[in-house]
Amino acid sequence: MITIGITGGIGSGKSVVSRILLTLGIPVYDSDSRAKWLNDHSPVVRQALTGLIGSDLYENGILRRDRLAAAIFSSGDLLEQVNGIIHPEVKKDFCQWRSECESDLCAIESAILFSSGFNSLCDTVIRVDAPEKIRQERAMARDGSSAETMRQRMLSQEREQSLAKAGADHTVLNAPPHLLVPQVVRIIETVRTKRPNPPDRL
């Protein structure tokens, strides 16, 4: 099975590309939503996070994300430790999901594909891009955030975006006059064409 990574900055249109792949019959793993699910339901994650931060991090069995964010904000090195807990569990969850896929291709969508190391699970990576102004406008309309809040979020992603720009195999442009669907379809055709032939059976 060939694994495709999908990444891009906020407002770039990663989820749109994921939906295109789904319409092409390619299953897509949403690492963000699965990470949130694991934060709430994985005993491994819960035990490690409460051991690191405190038992009041969970309320009625659900992670209080505001408390986690406050703890990370108050401690410079805590984010790396939290990621060290969550990312390995997401990788395990993805590998289990992939093993159950009945398809020649599958994909994983992640805004932090490279900094998390998820790119090591991929055979090829698609980076979704758009001009910064368009990305900001899209994200503000979607999230209802202020321009300053969105600017800070985009600044926080600069390192990841540099890694993605250097490491991605394909880039699609999700802004006029570029049409997104034909770009994605061409990449999938290329990936399928270049896949290695199975060995001859004796």
UniProtKB/Swiss-Prot annotation:
- Provide the Gene Ontology terms for cellular component: cytoplasm
Q: Where is the DPCK domain?
A: 3-202
Per the record, the similarity remark reads: Belongs to the CoaE family.
Question: What SUPFAM superfamilies is this protein classified in?
Answer: P-loop containing nucleoside triphosphate hydrolases
> Which species is the source of this protein?
Porphyromonas gingivalis (strain ATCC BAA-308 / W83)
- Output this protein's name: Dephospho-CoA kinase
Query: PANTHER family attached here?
Result: BIFUNCTIONAL COENZYME A SYNTHASE-RELATED, DEPHOSPHO-COA KINASE-RELATED
Give the reactions, separated by semicolons, that this protein catalyses: 3'-dephospho-CoA + ATP = ADP + CoA + H(+)
Mind listing the GO biological process terms from this record? coenzyme A biosynthetic process
**CDD domains, alphabetized:** DPCK
| Gene designation per UniProt | coaE
What function is annotated for this protein? Catalyzes the phosphorylation of the 3'-hydroxyl group of dephosphocoenzyme A to form coenzyme A.
Q: Where does ATP bind?
A: G11, S12, G13, K14, S15, V16
NCBIfam families for this protein: dephospho-CoA kinase
Query: Which Pfam families did the record assign?
Result: CoaE
Q: Predominant location of this chain?
A: cytoplasm
Q: Please give the pathway this protein is involved in.
A: Cofactor biosynthesis; coenzyme A biosynthesis; CoA from (R)-pantothenate: step 5/5
Q: Where is this region: Disordered?
A: 138-161
Task: Kindly list the places in or outside the cell where this protein is found, as annotated in its UniProt entry.
Answer: Cytoplasm
* Record EC number: 2.7.1.24
Q: Does the keyword Disulfide bond apply?
A: no
Q: Which UniProt keywords apply?
A: ATP-binding, Coenzyme A biosynthesis, Cytoplasm, Kinase, Nucleotide-binding, Transferase
